[in-house]
């Protein structure tokens, strides 16, 4: 069994009197890809921001196996500097976040771009890249920091099926190298095909992560089946 790299226990987040989620726990193992599904407004993106420290949790404990490695986040609305080429975008972010010399930063940036299949596009500016290639630059930018866990917020929202498949292949390559992934998405097909495990965040509660085949199968919990096919799965009766 792969070692655990991230453990979130009993997390709670509220905005005033409105509780977004409570008693939420997640465990991620090295090289695991977990997808979180849920309706809009369920708190999925807020959860990612809390994990990154961009928002504060109102309760709970986050533990990382390697705090020095930390986490990386690829935003849904990522931005690249249009006047810099792919290598420059990654190198700039790396040098801003870590005190590296120019030579070491460039070497790590080239390695990150190679990991996402852009070694032949290092000197292309964003305007000369497709949307999918621009997204890979954003992934390389986060990957160059060498995080133990990468977080993705709706990574397929602007991609067509072909580019979505390309992204899935890139992410699978990362997990094969030991990077753990936590992806928030509305793309059911992406989660079913590319995730190792899938969980549902709804009404402030997170279901137990299940292997993708089981999550999307006929024996999934009633709450999951109701989300996937509204009206098709009645709630299971409670114990008397």
Regions found by a protein language model. Give the residues of each.
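Catalytic Walker B motif of ABC-type/P-loop ATPase nucleotide-binding domains
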Residues: 150-153
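A short, proline-enriched helix->beta-strand linker immediately N-terminal to the Walker B motif
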Residues: 144-148
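Conserved ABC ATPase signature
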Residues: 125-129, 133
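Conserved ABC ATPase "signature" region
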Residues: 102-121
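Helix-to-loop junction immediately C-terminal to a conserved catalytic motif
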Residues: 52
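H-loop/switch region of ABC-family ATPase nucleotide-binding domains
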Residues: 185-186
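A short, surface-exposed alpha-helical micro-motif characterized by mixed small hydrophobic
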Residues: 191-193
């Amino acid at each position: 069994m792969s070692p655990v790299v991230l453990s979130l226990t009993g997390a709670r987040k509220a905005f005033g009197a409105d509780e977004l989620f409570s008693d939420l726990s997640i465990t991620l193992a090295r090289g695991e890809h977990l997808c979180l599904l849920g309706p809009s407004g369920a708190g999925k993106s807020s959860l990612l921001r809390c994990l990154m420290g961009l928002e504060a949790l109102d309760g709970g404990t986050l533990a990382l196996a390697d705090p020095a490695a930390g986490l990386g986040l690829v935003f849904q609305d990522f931005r690249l500097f249009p006047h810099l080429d792919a290598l420059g975008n990654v190198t700039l972010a790396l040098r801003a976040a870590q005190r590296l010399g120019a030579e070491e930063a460039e070497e790590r940036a080239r390695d990150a771009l190679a990991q996402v299949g852009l070694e032949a596009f290092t000197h292309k500016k964003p305007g000369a890249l497709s949307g999918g290639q621009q997204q890979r630059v954003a992934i390389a930018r986060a990957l160059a920091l060498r995080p133990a866990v990468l977080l993705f917020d709706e990574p397929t929202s602007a991609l067509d099926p072909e580019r979505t498949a390309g992204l899935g292949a890139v992410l699978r390559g990362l997990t094969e190298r030991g990077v753990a992934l936590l992806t928030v998405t509305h793309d059911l097909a992406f989660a079913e095909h590319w995730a190792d495990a899938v969980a549902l965040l709804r009404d402030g509660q997170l279901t137990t992560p299940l292997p993708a085949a089981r999550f999307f199968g006929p024996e999934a919990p009633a709450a999951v089946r109701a989300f996937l096919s509204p009206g098709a799965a009645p709630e299971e009766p409670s114990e008397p």
